[in-house]
Design a protein with these regions (language model features):
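Non-globular, low-confidence helical/coil segments that flank catalytic cores
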Residues: 1-36, 42-49, 55-371
Length: 371
């Protein structure tokens, strides 16, 4: 990794700091580049506050803050040098280590959807990626989070449907594809009139122009099945003969299975899709899941009572923007979850939501654990 300068991402927006603080120190000998990166920023104290806050997540913040406070009477330039050293130490100690087993992260992209999954073999999947209230969420939220985690390739970008809050970030990732980051394949729902849906057709054209392979999945199709690790992704919706009224209607639904864990990814699917799936499930004696990614950001018409009874999840993940104009998640939907003792996790309150499934346990964590 020689020749690559210090890569430090300290964003003006504190939301970015949460995900993308110090990415990598790859050449500590290049002092000139390191100095230039830091000295160009006017307020060293503000930088320090962001860095120490994030370091605190890793247990190092208190010690580093004490060192910095003791330097308060030192000149600005010397203080900057101290900060450089502390940045290097923090970056070395904060190197991201991938959890073993299956790792799932619902990113906070505001009013939109984005879920990253990494399987036991290191294959990366991105289920949707977009936002309507965060500008350039693909570049500043999704990409930076992935790079901080050391992810240089998304093997499968799995798109539920063509709405902007699910795809505009994916398009940004495609635009950024190159030597350091690539998108391998785009997976779209297999619908009847592919050309009649403008947003759907636009996503296909975007991927084609970038030279990215596109595959199509309908109910019953298997995206991946690894018997050696008991990992499987199956498309549950839309059905081949399904008559949809809008993009949300044909929103692809996927079942994630790994050992004894299962999660249903609903995209923007609502009651009509839920009913269709339950009719198809009649032949299956049992279809229970541990986790449900709530459809359509937890809208009033998602997660019907009969559907929740059918799948009986322990937790529900809801992706929505803080104080969004749609009032997602809807209070009636939250009441249904409460009445069935289903624990909700919300990006507008919890920020990023992580699930790690190892051989013997399922661990659920949130970035904001202050609640």
């Amino acid at each position: 990794m020689a020749g690559c300068p210090l890569a430090v991402w300290i964003a003006a927006d504190s939301e970015y700091v949460k995900y993308c603080t110090i990415y990598r120190v790859s050449n500590m000998s290049n002092v000139h580049d390191i100095w230039r990166n830091v000295s160009n920023v006017c307020n060293v104290h503000d930088i320090w506050q962001n860095v120490s806050n994030v370091c605190n997540l890793h247990g190092a913040g208190r010690s580093l803050r004490n060192i910095y406070r003791n330097s308060c009477n030192i000149s600005h330039n010397i203080k900057s040098v101290i900060l450089i050293v502390l940045l290097i130490l923090a970056a070395v100690n904060m190197r991201y280590v991938h959890p073993k087993g299956l790792y799932i992260m619902m990113l906070d992209v505001g009013q939109g959807d984005c879920i990253y999954i990494r399987d036991e073999n290191g294959i990366s999947y991105l289920f949707d990626g977009g936002s309507t209230d965060v500008k350039q969420a693909g570049k500043y939220r999704i990409y930076k989070t992935l790079r901080y985690m050391g992810i240089r390739r998304i093997d499968y970008a799995v798109i539920s449907h063509g709405d902007a809050d699910h795809v505009n970030g994916i398009k940004e990732l495609i635009d950024m594809s190159g030597a350091s980051f690539t998108v391998g394949e785009v997976v779209m729902p297999d619908i009847k009139d592919k050309d009649s849906e403008e947003s759907y057709a636009g996503m296909i054209e975007y991927a084609h122009k970038a030279g990215i392979n596109i595959s199509y999945k309908k109910a019953g199709d298997v995206l991946v099945c690894d018997n050696s690790t008991a990992f499987k992704i199956t498309c549950m919706h839309p059905c081949e003969s399904y008559d949809y009224e809008d993009a949300n209607d044909y929103s692809a639904v996927y079942m994630i299975e790994y050992k004894d864990f299962s999660m249903l990814m609903m995209g923007d699917a609502g009651k009509k899709a839920e009913k269709c799936m339950m009719n198809d499930w009649k032949e299956r004696k049992e279809l229970k899941v541990f986790a449900l990614k709530a459809g359509h950001h937890g809208s009033r018409y998602s997660c019907s009572e009969v559907f929740l009874e059918s799948i009986d999840p322990a937790i529900a993940l809801i992706s929505c923007g803080k104080d969004n104009r749609y009032k997602h998640p809807h209070k009636e939907m939250l009441t249904r979850l409460h009445n069935m003792d289903i624990k909700p996790y919300r990006t507008d309150e919890d920020d990023a939501i992580m699930i790690n499934v190892s051989a013997d346990k399922i661990k659920v964590q949130v970035y904001n654990d202050s609640r």
